[in-house]
Amino acid sequence: MSHDSEPQPVTAHPAGPLTGALKPPGDKSISHRAMIFGLLSVGETRVEGLLEGDDVLRTAAAVKALGAQVTREGEGRWRIVGVGIGGMQDPVGVLDFGNAGTGSRLMMGVVGGQPVTATFDGDASLRKRPMRRILDPILKMGAEVVSEAEGGRVPLTLRGPREAIPIRYELPVASAQIKSAVLLAGLNAPGTTTVIEKAASRDHTERMLRLFGADVSVTPSGEGGHGRTVTLTGQPTLRGTDVIVPADPSSAAFPLVAALIVPGSEVILRGVMMNPLRTGLITTLIEMGADIERFDEREEGGETVADLRVRASRLRGVDVPAERAPSMIDEYPILAVAAAFAEGTTRMNGLHELRVKESDRLAAVAAGLAANGVGHDIEGDDLIVTGNGGPPAGGGTVATHLDHRIAMAFLVMGLATRKPVTVDDGAMIATSFPSFRPTMLALGARIEDGAAA
């Protein structure tokens, strides 16, 4: 959604049981990376199950602008003919990433390690998001910021070096985006690039580097072996390959929690990625008493996937440890909704990273809970939600701040509250889950345009 579009309010009404089976959309993290590795490889990459949301399509457009041939061959089926490491061209015009934080940050790593100059921009939400943590290591690797908005934000122009400088970099926070940007820049560095993280973050970039033929090693490190040291040998020849994109656990979270909180529901989610660095929400919900059955486990696109059977459940409050945050950072809004229906108090610890997402997600979630009569508190970077085991009042209007996950989380809430819940704008849902409404309607949900009457 562009920052000058008219808001499109959407309202969710209390629904009867949700039933049926669905395949959630392709994983957004892997879809971005499949496009980017298609650009950086030699030869042809074919992708199946690509998430065709606005975020990923912006990355596809950037990949094409940097010199790759990009062709859509059918629903979710794409063909990329890459230019190889060092073979990119300066794009004509600005790389407009819309709302895509992941796409823009990963591509800064790509541009920051290659002999190319590009200008990055985005919508009103992306223009507020900090890029300095991405830029800091890339500048150490030889990139140069030609111009930037205040505070290292977009719009900014980045010029990469002829060859990147290999570095050893310790991440200031657990962030797959920073780690990936350094590794992507390191692809054009002679020698070894090393990234050290105190807590393991999503490892999709490391897995995809291996899939395309790079020499990358990952070893446990740090206190208790919870950290990781990732070592990449630079200037490989990446070879185009086939990528099957598994279903996105962050998108699956919305119908999954809906099935838990709408009485009498039973829903099957097919082909959901079960990467242990992405399943913190499922772990937490099971601790809360959720009836989630995992079956038919298999491998797809270098990742483990499984089908999930989810039944309506009585949930109880739990304490969610801060170290689980990297494995579920995008799922806290929908976890807060589940917690609103649970008996007792749920405490989500260490949510600082939520303050620098598409919105200040911590503040946005708290405001949404308040608007719908849910007891909650913020202590430092911890969110505390208190439920009574029954449905909250609902009846509120939630300010989404152009954040797709806030919009979907509170629409799910409205399917089981006593009164309908309205979100002030549902247009940006297309960034990650374009089929959200038809998918939910097919299960029996009632979601309508406009504010509640």
Swiss-Prot record:
Residues annotated as binding 3-phosphoshikimate: K28, S29, R33, S175, Q177, D330, K357
Pathway the protein contributes to: Metabolic intermediate biosynthesis; chorismate biosynthesis; chorismate from D-erythrose 4-phosphate and phosphoenolpyruvate: step 6/7
Reactions the enzyme catalyzes: 3-phosphoshikimate + phosphoenolpyruvate = 5-O-(1-carboxyvinyl)-3-phosphoshikimate + phosphate
EC number: 2.5.1.19
Predominant localisation class: cytoplasm
UniProt subcellular location: Cytoplasm
EC class name: transferase
Residue ranges, annotated region (Disordered): 1-25
Pfam families listed in its UniProt record: EPSP_synthase
GO function term, MF aspect, one: 3-phosphoshikimate 1-carboxyvinyltransferase activity
GO biological process, one term: chorismate biosynthetic process
Annotated keywords: Amino-acid biosynthesis, Aromatic amino acid biosynthesis, Cytoplasm, Transferase
GO cellular component, one term: cytoplasm
Residues involved in phosphoenolpyruvate binding: K28, G101, R129, Q177, R361, R405
Active-site residues from the entry: D330 (proton acceptor)
Record Gene3D superfamilies: Enolpyruvate transferase domain
Subunit structure: Monomer.
Family in the record: Belongs to the EPSP synthase family.
Purpose: Catalyzes the transfer of the enolpyruvyl moiety of phosphoenolpyruvate (PEP) to the 5-hydroxyl of shikimate-3-phosphate (S3P) to produce enolpyruvyl shikimate-3-phosphate and inorganic phosphate.
Name of this protein: 3-phosphoshikimate 1-carboxyvinyltransferase
Gene source species: Methylorubrum populi (strain ATCC BAA-705 / NCIMB 13946 / BJ001) (Methylobacterium populi)
